[in-house]
């Protein structure tokens, strides 16, 4: 079963990008319209890599940094394309 959240904050960029791609495909196939990507706050390296990947991914309609009660800069909220 696919969760509505992917936690990448303990991953390296090299580990995170393939996992993110697979997760977005799985979430789309599971029918999710919105998912959360947890990348942590840290130095922002992982967040920047996730942002680059989301900009080019064909299943991503839009994305934004999490709000005050969503994890703020440690989380990205992703809206997926419609099926």
Give the predicted meaning of each segment.
Residues 1-83:
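Long, charged, low-complexity intrinsically disordered regions
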